């Protein structure tokens, strides 16, 4: 039986009144589902404080790093079609040399990028490439590479991997990444979503969930009920002419690493597709072998083979957060010393991805054994306290378990 609970209150207008209130989400949404559909929905708070608009499970939000999982689904569709190869050297496809400067004879492959084992770091940047810029300028910078580890030998979570994946997808098809994802993933699954707003309808953008910093100030997607005038980083000449796009030159343009705008209900449809081995509502998006390829860990933590923490400025990534990782898919509840990757606290293995950016925390997790899953997000929780039993925050632990 589907149950819907909604709460919108003036409490959220006073976010910064005290430290205890500062940890209360401006908006939070949680959707539980199984293979057949949604079984429970909880929504509370405000999607837009200034407008007084209550949050709902149909409101699109910048879902942060869960975007990586969705990007990988699109990439796997191209692998199935023979347009991409998980283990081929990407340099010839990209049209520019992609090599670790300390290990120039080691090819960089799609598999290494999707599993954060290519030897790349975010030290040279990854998202602020202007409309007329080239992603190769980032990878040509020695700071973009981990000089201590050869590709394929070490896990180091890095956002920059995914703009490169998007560039490869564009070169393989000649299509712009955001439009390609509409064709490969969103349209077949009947999901109203987009990367960086450009390919979303105005009506969808009008329901955007605004993201708030610790002080309660809007920090992202505060577009007053409209699509933004420019959905990408402007060119060096400050224009927003998308006709300048060239396949593969700048895969960062539509933020494949974090810029997916999607509702909790839309993300639940993607979770159901994964639970059903690539099928949703009689539409086969992926073959079971592709779903297994995505979800099978390519890396499992040991003392000397990777970092269990994301190197970012959020302050919310803790040691033990990553312990198993596939092709843009994280596996939870690793029973190994040093691992604290179980926000549910029940020891059950789940797969999916977490997200954290601009005051938002999010998660998509499925339990394949029971055929169930959950999607959640919360905004305005930049200062969320540490969790009680995992490397996740207290907010994520509550949303994962469905407790208030």
Which residue ranges define each predicted feature?
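Bacterial N-terminal signal peptides that target proteins for export
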Residues: 1-8
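Sec/Tat signal peptide C-region and signal peptidase I cleavage site
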Residues: 18-22
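Short, conserved catalytic-motif segment at the N-terminal edge
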Residues: 23-61, 83, 144
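Active-site SXXK
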Residues: 30, 36, 60-90, 162-170, ...
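Short, surface-exposed loop or secondary-structure junction motifs
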Residues: 48, 101-348
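Short, glycine/proline-biased beta-turn/loop segments that scaffold the active-site neighborhood
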Residues: 86-101, 187-189
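Short, surface-exposed beta-strand/loop micro-motifs that present aromatic residues
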Residues: 352, 360-370
